[in-house]
Regions:
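C-terminal catalytic "cap/lid" subdomain
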Residues: 1-137
């Protein structure tokens, strides 16, 4: 396994062009040019934190469901809001599990450190307000 390095090299103009377009792809390469696995939510959260130092920032995570669901098989079981106080019981009860855990934990860290809100929603719901909003308590 290739060791991880914490040095990032990038072309700033490429990053700003993508941010201004509202899209950020997270292709991460190792020292030898090999493509590495990277959590896109972690990258998006880090970029949002940087943006929050400059201007009020809201972050949206898009995926295939309308948001965080109490029952993954029931699209009407949407949880409208999650905070640092309401998250632990959801995790303990298994309502939040698997890949949703890092998504919500990244969102909670982002709002704790200055991002106004993080919304988890389907790309089909970008303009209609449907989704789960993660807020600071």
């Amino acid at each position: 396994m290739e060791p991880l390095y914490f040095f990032i090299s990038f072309e700033p103009s490429h990053l700003f062009t993508r941010i201004n377009a509202g899209v950020l792809l997270d292709f991460i390469y190792g020292r030898k040019g090999t493509l590495l696995n990277c959590n896109a939510d972690s990258v998006a959260s880090a970029v949002a934190l940087g943006a929050a130092e400059i201007a009020p920032t809201d972050l949206v995570f898009c995926f295939e469901k309308a948001g965080v669901l109490r029952n993954p098989d029931d699209d009407t079981s949407l949880i409208r809001e999650i905070t640092a106080a309401t998250y632990p019981p959801l995790k303990a009860d298994g309502v939040v599990s698997k890949g949703m855990i890092p998504k919500i934990e990244n969102a909670l860290k982002a709002v704790e450190k200055g991002v106004r809100s993080v919304t988890i929603r389907s790309s089909e719901n970008l303009s209609n307000g449907i989704g789960t909003v993660i807020r600071n308590s």
